[in-house]
């Protein structure tokens, strides 16, 4: 029987006297069909290494280890380490690292793979409260992970994968899609977790682009401008720009000029701008001396 089988999960938790900690956002998946779908979505085979974040008691790790060359699982909760040693004992291609992924030296850690030159995919069931910081840390980090298949709160998955002119579209959509393609693969109902969370989850598949989707003069400034445009979603782009950059006559003249160069109407809202539009705007703002 699988670790994810509800009776097995309960038995493991009872045997080790494990209690859930809200501070870690722990929700363990107990549906083997969904676990298999995650592995299939990630296209895991013996030609790839996997970094897993938040293995819990090893339900997904079991499926990954059966299919991948190697799995390196990062678990922050000390109490789960002996449980994982028990549940994953039959595998010789799994390393469990008791560390916060945000603090890990991944450049060094991945050298512990037997074949560190294999492509590395990131597969994770991320705690809702820290999904965005972990994702951006890995996407923007020094290691160009080729692919991410991540379970997260459905609302966050919708925001990351959103297109312009939708309610979900915002600076997070732009921050991720600048580097990656992003698509919701399927929805995971809250009922298949122990304990059950308050909302449904989604599996989001992100694949790194060969190069960023647009070329910009200053990446940091580009992301700053995209954030400014969504500070007040109901306000026009002009109102958000003047609120952030200033309302002096000189500044307003520069903003008008930049919008003219970028061929963007000041009366539209940020959600109407595509990533190329934001790139044009950021470069134009630089050009006029903002």
Swiss-Prot record:
Keywords on record: Cytoplasm, Methyltransferase, RNA-binding, rRNA processing, S-adenosyl-L-methionine, Transferase
UniProt-listed Pfam families: RrnaAD
Compartments where found: Cytoplasm
Molecular-function annotations in GO: 16S rRNA (adenine(1518)-N(6)/adenine(1519)-N(6))-dimethyltransferase activity; RNA binding
Keyword Oxidoreductase attributed: no
InterPro entries assigned: KsgA/Erm, rRNA_Ade_diMease-like_C, rRNA_Ade_Mease_Trfase_CS, rRNA_Ade_methylase_Trfase_N, rRNA_adenine_dimethylase, SAM-dependent_MTases_sf
The reaction(s) this protein catalyses: adenosine(1518)/adenosine(1519) in 16S rRNA + 4 S-adenosyl-L-methionine = N(6)-dimethyladenosine(1518)/N(6)-dimethyladenosine(1519) in 16S rRNA + 4 S-adenosyl-L-homocysteine + 4 H(+)
Keyword Repressor applies: no
Gene Ontology, cellular component aspect: cytosol
Positions annotated to bind S-adenosyl-L-methionine: 27, 29, 54, 75, 100, 125
EC number per UniProt: 2.1.1.182
HAMAP family, sorted: 16SrRNA_methyltr_A
Function: Specifically dimethylates two adjacent adenosines (A1518 and A1519) in the loop of a conserved hairpin near the 3'-end of 16S rRNA in the 30S particle. May play a critical role in biogenesis of 30S subunits.
Family, similarity comment: Belongs to the class I-like SAM-binding methyltransferase superfamily. rRNA adenine N(6)-methyltransferase family. RsmA subfamily.
Protein name per Swiss-Prot or TrEMBL: Ribosomal RNA small subunit methyltransferase A
Originating species: Streptococcus agalactiae serotype III (strain NEM316)
């Amino acid at each position: 029987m699988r670790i994810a089988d509800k009776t097995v999960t309960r038995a493991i938790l009872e045997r080790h006297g494990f209690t859930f900690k809200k501070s870690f956002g722990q929700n363990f998946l107990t549906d083997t069909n969904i676990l298999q779908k995650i592995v299939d979505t990630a296209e895991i085979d013996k030609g790839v290494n996997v970094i897993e974040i938040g293995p819990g008691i090893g339900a997904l790790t079991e499926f990954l280890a059966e299919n991948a060359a190697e799995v390196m699982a990062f678990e922050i909760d000390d109490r789960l380490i002996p449980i994982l040693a028990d549940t994953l004992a039959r595998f010789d291609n799994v390393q469990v690292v008791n560390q916060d992924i945000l603090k890990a030296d991944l450049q060094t850690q991945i050298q512990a793979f037997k074949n560190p030159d294999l492509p590395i995919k990131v597969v994770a069931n991320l705690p809702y409260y820290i999904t965005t910081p972990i994702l951006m840390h890995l996407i923007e980090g020094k290691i160009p992970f080729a692919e991410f298949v991540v379970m997260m709160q459905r609302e966050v998955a919708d925001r990351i994968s959103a297109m312009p002119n939708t309610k979900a579209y915002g600076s997070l959509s732009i921050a991720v899609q600048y580097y990656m393609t992003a698509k919701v693969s399927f929805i995971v109902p809250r009922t298949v977790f122990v304990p059950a969370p308050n909302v449904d989850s989604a599996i989001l598949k992100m694949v790194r682009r060969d190069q960023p989707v647009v070329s910009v003069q200053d990446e940091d400034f580009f992301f700053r401008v995209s954030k400014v445009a969504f500070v007040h979603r109901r306000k026009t782009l002009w109102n958000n720009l003047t609120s952030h950059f200033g309302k002096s006559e000189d500044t307003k003249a520069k903003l008008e000029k930049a919008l003219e160069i970028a061929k963007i109407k000041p009366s539209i809202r940020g959600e109407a701008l595509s990533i190329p539009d934001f790139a044009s705007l950021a470069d134009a703002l630089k050009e006029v001396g903002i």
